[in-house]
Amino acid sequence: MKTTQDDETKKKQPVIRLVTLSTCFFCSKVKRMLDKEGFDYTYTDLDLMPEEERDAQLSQIKKFNPEESFPIVIINNIAIVGYQEERIKQELGIL
């Protein structure tokens, strides 16, 4: 079976998940950077979630991010807390 360039690119793309706040400047900035670089990602705006779900998420987040800083960028199961552009780009292989 022959694959197209797009199929190959999609296979190489890392799994990216963001935990963000809808009002967070740096959260928006990381989304724009990922969009500009052409990466697919999923995100959750915690402040827009129902209270019970948000509290459950925050209890998990506190385990590795006690200050509850945002954004949280998870690339292939590696969590980067805060907007650390250079580190994010290193993990994405674009630096």
Language model features with spans:
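Local sequence-structure signature of Cys/Sec-based thiol-disulfide redox active-site neighborhoods
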Residues: 2-41
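Conserved N-terminal glycine/acidic-rich loop preference
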Residues: 34-35, 40, 80-91
